[in-house]
């Protein structure tokens, strides 16, 4: 199969993706900037710092965090967002499919009210460790691009069962500007590794959310192109902040 697939819905090998992030987590101590572990940009470490600062500064004030909120972070990685929100909320639950990333998160964020689990997102949304409570805020930042279509639909559908009326969702993803683009185990000179991801379009994400989560209202959504790189002409960053109103 071609390494770059345009327009078509094809699956990526999630086993390779897990291995990719496990290996990156193991090298975190050797990195000039640890956020490149999850935000990539290995050849420009300062980009990861700028992106992290920009996203947190842009999004966190919109999340209405307080000590009564319970947060679910799906695809939490090394705890980048946990570090920013955990001391402002009642409880935080982070899930990631990379055991090595979860190990780093547990080292980085040691609050007693933070809980980290190694699971795929679709498994987590059916696991009693996660389903035992409702959440006031669900974060899915930079993770849907690593989930194949059927599993993503099921994950979005299951999310409805875990939120309260008026709960918030924050989504952020790398997206195809013009059309869907799948990188199918492609060699990256910047990362010095094989890489796979699905860059759905903004419209595709909105359609999936509307159909499978259902009952949400958009507070705001759009492109986060402040730090888009000139050489990445086919992709951008998209975000959405939504509130669950019930079916």
Model-derived regions: residue spans:
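Class I (Rossmann-like) S-adenosyl-L-methionine-dependent methyltransferase catalytic domain
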Residues: 1-67, 74-129, 147-154, 158, ...
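A conserved beta-strand element that flanks and buttresses the S-adenosyl-L-methionine
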Residues: 139
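Hydrophobic adenine-recognition pocket in adenosine-nucleotide-binding enzymes
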Residues: 143
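Conserved helix-to-beta-strand junction in the class I
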Residues: 161-163
């Amino acid at each position: 199969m071609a390494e770059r697939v345009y327009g078509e819905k094809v699956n990526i090998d999630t086993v390779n993706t897990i291995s990719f992030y496990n290996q990156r987590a193991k090298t975190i101590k050797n990195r000039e900037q640890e956020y490149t572990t999850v935000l990539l940009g290995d050849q420009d470490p300062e980009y990861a710092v700028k992106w992290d600062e920009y996203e947190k500064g842009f999004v966190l004030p919109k999340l209405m965090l307080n000590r009564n909120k319970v947060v679910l972070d799906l695809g939490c990685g090394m705890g980048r967002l946990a570090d920013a929100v955990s001391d402002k909320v009642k409880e935080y639950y982070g899930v990631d499919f990379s055991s090595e990333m979860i190990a780093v998160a547990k080292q980085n964020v040691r609050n007693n009210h933070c809980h980290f689990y190694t699971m795929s997102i679709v498994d987590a949304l059916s696991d009693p460790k996660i389903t035992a409570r409702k959440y006031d805020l669900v974060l899915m930042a930079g993770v849907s691009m690593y989930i194949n279509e059927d599993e993503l639909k099921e994950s979005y559908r299951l999310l409805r069962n875990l939120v309260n009326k008026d709960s918030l969702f924050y989504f952020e993803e790398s997206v195809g500007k013009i059309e869907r683009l799948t990188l199918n185990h492609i060699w990256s000179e910047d990362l010095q590794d094989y890489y796979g991801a699905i860059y759905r379009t903004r419209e595709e994400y909105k359609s999936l959310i509307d159909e499978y989560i259902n009952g949400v209202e958009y507070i705001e959504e759009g492109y986060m192109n402040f730090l888009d790189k000139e050489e990445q002409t086919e992709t951008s960053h998209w975000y959405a902040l939504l509130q669950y109103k019930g079916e």
